[in-house]
Design a protein with these regions (language model features):
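Conserved N-terminal glycine-rich FAD pyrophosphate-binding loop of Rossmann-like flavoproteins
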Residues: 1
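General beta-strand structural signal in soluble alpha/beta enzymes
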Residues: 49, 77-81, 121-125, 253-255
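Short, conserved active-site loop motifs that form the nucleotide-linked donor/cofactor pocket
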Residues: 7-9, 119
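Glycine-rich beta-alpha junction loops
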Residues: 54, 81-87, 103, 125-130, ...
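Catalytic cores of large soluble enzymes that bind and process phosphate-bearing ligands
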Residues: 25-28, 61, 102, 157, ...
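NAD(P)-dependent Rossmann-like dehydrogenase/reductase catalytic/cofactor-binding core
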Residues: 4, 137, 142-145, 152-155, ...
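Rossmann-like NAD(P)(H) cofactor-binding subdomain of soluble oxidoreductases
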Residues: 4, 11-94, 110-112
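Internal alpha-helical scaffold of NAD(P)-dependent oxidoreductase catalytic cores
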Residues: 39, 68-77, 94-181
């Protein structure tokens, strides 16, 4: 059984842990993030986000995790994302990730912190592209789960899904880099891993196979399939789906939109048939 290394210390008071540190890694479910941000002080810290959630501000605009943290604090926020299963990291399998930053000096510091013999990182100044890859690839993985055991269709969905990921990201933040999506570990690499092994994909498979496809099933499946673990994937589906609907982008992003309809609307059955037959 795996154990934490001896230099890892646990605190019951989050503020004590933060006050003792100058680099903070945030890896919590996104639906709890704002509540926690209101209770802590991250000013003048280096913050590394592993959170794969998207938010909507008071004006109805999309906000990424890094952007949300920067709304609360004067701090330098970095995004770390890549194709990594915790069990594989624990085995010290060769792995990689992408560090998304706004300045190279901080990026090099974080790279030095994470790099070792089996874990390699690459730096990019496309922080927003890295974040959007992490958010949107989880939605495509939900679609893969809906398809079930159809390998040819899954390959088609991944290919077209990657294109929709990049096109939608350009609409949200027009300075994202194509390289981030098609050549980086956080893009095509993480998309592949998540679509094969991701928890969202597993959850979606059970969701589509249930007798009644209903949005209320998501929380029930988290309890039964994931033993109560909370994941952001289906919540991100809802936010992105409503965004596409609001902006009349339905025909530009049929994969994202049909995944949303299966997950959160009364048109689930019809949309599931469409997804399986009209990719």
């Amino acid at each position: 059984k795996s154990k934490f290394p001896s230099n890892v210390k646990a605190y019951t008071n989050i503020n004590i842990a933060i006050n003792k540190s100058n680099i903070i890694i945030i890896a919590i479910p996104g639906n709890f993030l704002e509540e926690i941000l209101k209770k802590i002080d991250l000013n003048n810290k280096i913050v590394i986000s592993l959170v794969k959630s998207v938010f909507v501000d008071q004006t109805g605009e999309i906000v990424t995790t890094c952007e949300l943290i920067e709304k609360y604090f004067q701090t330098n926020v970095i995004c770390l994302s890549g194709p990594n299963l915790y069990s594989s990291l624990d085995n010290k399998d060769l792995s990689e990730a992408t560090i998304g930053v706004n300045d190279l000096e901080t990026g090099n510091l974080v790279k030095k912190l994470f790099n070792n013999d089996f874990f390699k990182t690459q730096i990019t100044l496309d922080r927003c592209g890295v974040e959007l890859c992490g958010i949107l690839k989880n939605i495509i993985a939900i679609g893969v789960g809906f398809l079930g055991n159809k390998p040819n269709s899954v390959a088609l969905l991944i290919r077209k899904g990657l294109n929709e990921m990049y096109k939608l990201s350009l609409k949200l933040r027009n300075n994202v880099s194509k390289h981030t999506f098609y050549e980086s570990s956080c893009g095509i690499g993480d998309l592949y891993l998540t679509c094969v092994f991701g928890r969202g994909k597993i959850l979606a498979k059970h969701y589509s196979e249930s007798n009644i496809i209903d949005s209320s099933n998501w929380e029930k499946l988290e309890e039964t399939i994931l033993c109560g673990m909370k994941i952001p994937d289906h919540h991100n589906v809802k936010i992105i789906g409503k965004l596409i609907e609001k902006n009349c982008w339905i025909h530009e992003f049929p994969i994202f939109y049909n995944i949303y309809k299966i997950s959160w609307t009364n048109d689930s059955e019809k949309s599931l048939i469409y997804l399986k037959r009209n990719l």
